[in-house]
Amino acid sequence: MANGNSATLTRRYNRTVVLDALRRHGSLSRVELARLSGLTPQGIRNIIEDLIDTGLVRETGRRRGQRGQPQIDIEINPGAGYCLGLHVAAGLCHAIATDLAGNVLARPEARAFNGDHGQRLNALEVISHEIEAAAGGLSRLGTGVVVSRPLASRWSATGGLADAQAEFAKPFEALFASAPLVFENDANAAAMAEYTHGQAKGRGDFLYLFLGEGVGGAIVQSGVPVHGGRGNAGEFGHILIDPKGPKCHCGNRGCLHGYLALDGLRHFLPTDAPLAPETLPQAWLDGAASALSRALVSLENIFDPQAIVLGGTAPVWLLHKLVERMGDPGPSVRSDAAETRVEVSGLGQSCALIGAAALPLLALTSPDPATLMKEPSVET
């Protein structure tokens, strides 16, 4: 017999199943939700009643032009609260607040984020006050924090952290742990932005190649980023392109990083020359496009993704130049796919920040079967 704790976990899981269906499909009737989720009609009615009471979903009216009793559509209520996204990079903390439909409510000026715990906490307090003032009384439903480096694991406010990560997390936990708090690396966050708002929407199995000062990536399976045993999955920048190629900081030679990363591109530019379409060296573009083509063929053969999205903090025009110069990659298991094999992100250089705000939304709406197996907490 199920005890009270397992029944509570089951209800929570079923609730996320319903929210996930609404997030992916938009407006749905109770009948459609029952069919998509596999839950009973009575179970759906109970869940929807609870979600309406909490304000997370709303009825949008009856459908017209159908036989019989018109069905009532249900959708996630965009104004149920806001999600806060924070991206820490190059000594700055960037912030954004969105509603549950992804509409931007506030995007304050980036703040310096260095120094000791107190200085960082002060910067976050300023950001928090600016966001709250712009949110118009909406409740914060969660916070996503994105950093430009791999993490030992997908952080949560209750998960175990390595010492350095735990120290970094302290000011965020001091201000934001009252609601779900999720930490993630920039490539995985950018991939989640694509999954919720961009090129990968509706496609749960895809790869994301993050091009910036370095080269990273994300592997998304069933709508969830793969982190690997030590949090380093998706380090596409260290795919070996040419064993006789340039020396990489990892110790190998000929890694993709050496051909694609912006820090390497600058060595091709005259001193103090700006990175612009008219100054882009053809020699770099030729080598980068060739290396990208080789890497993509390998990735397709290993993962057979529904899509590969190219994005990051590199200028969008540069991403398009790379794809145009590359042309169609060589033969792979996806060679005969009807879809475009490589798609450039439409989210621009703020992709990781947009993804940071998407993280708490996904935490709220993504069903995780592992939650059904959690041990009951012991209260003292």
Feature locations, PLM:
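Glycine-rich phosphate-binding loop and adjoining helix at the ATP-binding site
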Residues: 104-205, 319-332
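Glycine-rich phosphate-binding loop of actin/hexokinase-like ATP-binding domains
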Residues: 203-259
